[in-house]
């Protein structure tokens, strides 16, 4: 059985950084599932499609090539907004499920980050983290990231985006963003990157010890 590390949480919570650091530590492959939805959104935007159209979004998801995750466009603010809109469609989530599930079953283990990994994609994951932070802190992080990418946007605009995405991600009927009952909450609001990673490492090490000795 693969040792799956599921890292869930809202946008700009620090989950991607935590996940990538954990993957490097354990030498596990990593999948950022948010990029899948961003890539689907970018496909639609490139074709002048509507991310709110469930049929067009599902077609885009089924035609997605994994290489498209490497496009710089998937890291933009527009891609993030489109991703949140296409992710509400059950057909899109179904189209991408097998790809994510197959990745989760890789031996000896893997790291997957997203919104529904511990609840839908890999509910059996031995290590589950729910990484979060206040909307204001997350908005400040994302704003600085976008400025570094050359995008022109205000902090207030980014905060509005964050709040809108939280509402959409948490309120969708299909696989809403929520903390799994057995996930450990990691609030990074007042943590540095190193502090967040160290806390995450301890959580995973505890899970690994329990996984290796289930009766312990």
Swiss-Prot record:
CDD domains: CMPK (cd02020). ATP binds at residues 9-17. One of its GO terms (molecular function) is CMP kinase activity. Its EC number is 2.7.4.25. Disulfide bonds: none annotated. InterPro entries: Cytidylate_kin (IPR003136), Cytidylate_kinase_dom (IPR011994), P-loop_NTPase (IPR027417). It is found in: Cytoplasm. It catalyses: CMP + ATP = CDP + ADP; dCMP + ATP = dCDP + ADP. Keywords: ATP-binding, Cytoplasm, Kinase, Nucleotide-binding, Transferase. One of its GO terms (biological process) is pyrimidine nucleotide metabolic process. One of its GO terms (cellular component) is cytoplasm. HAMAP family: Cytidyl_kinase_type1. Belongs to the cytidylate kinase family. Type 1 subfamily. This is Cytidylate kinase.
């Amino acid at each position: 059985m693969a040792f799956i590390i599921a890292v869930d949480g809202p946008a700009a919570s620090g989950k991607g950084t935590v996940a990538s650091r954990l993957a490097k530590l354990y030498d596990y492959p990593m999948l950022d599932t948010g990029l899948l939805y961003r890539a689907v959104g970018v496909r639609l935007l490139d074709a002048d499609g509507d991310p709110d159209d469930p049929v067009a979004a599902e077609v885009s998801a089924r035609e997605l090539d994994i290489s498209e995750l490497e496009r710089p466009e998937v890291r933009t603010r527009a891609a993030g907004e489109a991703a949140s809109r296409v992710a509400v469609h059950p057909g899109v989530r179904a189209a991408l499920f097998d790809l994510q599930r197959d990745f989760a079953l890789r031996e000896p283990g893997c790291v997957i980050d997203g919104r529904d990994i511990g609840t839908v994609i890999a509910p059996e994951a031995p290590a589950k983290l729910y990484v979060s932070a206040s909307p204001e802190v997350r908005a400040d992080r994302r704003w600085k990231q976008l400025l570094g990418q050359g995008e022109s946007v205000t902090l207030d605009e980014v905060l509005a985006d964050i709040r809108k995405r939280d509402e959409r991600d948490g309120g969708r009927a299909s696989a809403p963003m929520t903390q799994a009952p057995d996930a450990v909450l990691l609030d990074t609001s007042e943590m540095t990157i190193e502090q967040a990673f160290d806390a995450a490492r301890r959580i995973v090490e505890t899970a690994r010890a329990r996984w290796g000795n289930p009766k312990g």
